[in-house]
């Protein structure tokens, strides 16, 4: 339909009401867009000083002009969302929030537009907008309780899926977003993959030997475990100084025989699950209690995938932490004869 570009009332009503249509047609959207753009392009003319009613003061006239401009940009943003023109939607609703920060509905639209652009590096910004939309009170431009609850539920679900369960972080984001309409420069929420990588790196730095062992175990229990063992471990000393690691560390499960053993079974990943069997080239002195921490390096010779276990040939000198001592031989003194 053709819109009278000089009729403020007609343009205003079309711009206002297009957002209220439950299922706007392409023609409805086109008319709304034309009307909103007509308002913006004729704004100075519509609100010229010589057109101000005598009963309206200057401040109210200027406010009416600003409100009309905001309505036009709000409508253009909404129309762009319906058309899946997400870049335009983002630009228009950002203009609205820059002029009127307290508008939960528009904050939600901004978050929706950012997500729809499918740029994962910007999802933190979208979460900020969802948090704000679900946190603003009605007196601050928030939505009615039912709509607010729906958006907040969506925010929680989206946050947890992106970042993982973090009640403290979620509550903090709510407070930050409620206080200001846009996140600060450099704002970032780490996603689950980034957090996983970060935690793995921290773990590796604090427990390099255990981290290496867990990586080996992951390879060995994977679909190509046997091939990995034969090509990368069997017959070679492990860990062998790789990444600066000289020894693995485990806890004693059992020793055979109990005294002066030549075979040790150790747990590494957790203290109760046997994972390695050490065959020694010479018996160790004395004995050790289960749970004793043992360090070792050796040559893998066999591997069981299902009930995970690696057998190592180990030189006695490459065992550290063994507390047993050789028994001190009893010295027998000859009997002293008495003089008769």
Describe each PLM feature range:
Residues 1, 39, 95-96, 133:
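Canonical positions in the second alpha-helix
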Residues 3-24, 38-53, 63-79, 105-113, ...:
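Amphipathic alpha-helical repeat scaffolds of TPR domains
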Residues 19, 30-44, 118-142, 156:
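TPR/TPR-like (Sel1-like) alpha-helical repeat modules
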Residues 21-26, 83, 117-120:
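Structural motif corresponding to the intra-repeat A-B loop/turn of tetratricopeptide repeats
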Residues 118, 126-130, 147, 267-272:
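Mature extracellular/secreted ectodomains of secretory-pathway proteins
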Residues 167-340:
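OB-fold and OB-like single-stranded nucleic-acid-recognition modules
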């Amino acid at each position: 339909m053709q819109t009278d570009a000089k009729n403020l009332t007609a343009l205003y009503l079309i711009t206002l009401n297009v957002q209220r249509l439950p299922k706007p047609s392409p023609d409805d959207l086109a008319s709304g867009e034309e009307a909103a753009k007509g308002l913006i392009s004729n704004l100075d003319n519509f609100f010229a000083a010589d057109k101000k009613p005598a009963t309206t003061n200057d401040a109210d006239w200027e406010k009416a002009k600003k409100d009309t401009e905001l309505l036009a940009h709000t409508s253009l943003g909404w129309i762009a969302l319906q058309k899946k023109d997400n870049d335009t939607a983002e630009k228009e609703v950002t203009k609205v929030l820059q002029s009127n920060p307290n508008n939960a509905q528009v904050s939600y639209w901004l978050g929706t537009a950012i997500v729809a652009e499918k740029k994962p590096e910007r999802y933190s910004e979208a979460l900020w907008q969802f948090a704000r939309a679900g946190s603003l009170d009605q007196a601050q431009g928030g939505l009615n309780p039912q709509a607010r609850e729906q958006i907040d539920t969506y925010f929680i679900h989206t946050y947890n899926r992106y970042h993982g369960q973090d009640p403290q972080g979620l509550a903090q984001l709510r407070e930050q977003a409620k206080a200001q309409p846009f996140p600060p420069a450099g704002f970032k929420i780490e996603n689950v993959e980034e957090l996983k990588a970060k935690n793995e790196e921290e773990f590796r730095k604090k427990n390099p030997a255990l981290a290496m062992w867990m990586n080996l175990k992951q390879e060995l229990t994977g679909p190509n475990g046997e091939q990995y063992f034969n090509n990368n471990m069997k017959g070679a000393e492990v860990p062998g100084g790789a990444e600066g690691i000289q020894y693995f560390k485990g806890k004693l499960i059992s020793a055979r025989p109990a005294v002066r053993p030549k075979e040790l079974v150790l747990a590494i990943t957790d203290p109760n699950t046997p994972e390695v069997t050490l065959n020694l080239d010479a018996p160790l002195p004395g004995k050790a209690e289960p749970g004793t921490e043992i360090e070792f390096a050796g040559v893998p010779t066999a591997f069981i995938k299902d009930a995970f276990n690696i057998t190592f040939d180990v030189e006695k000198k490459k065992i550290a932490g063994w507390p047993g001592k050789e028994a001190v031989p009893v010295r027998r003194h000859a009997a002293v004869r008495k003089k008769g």
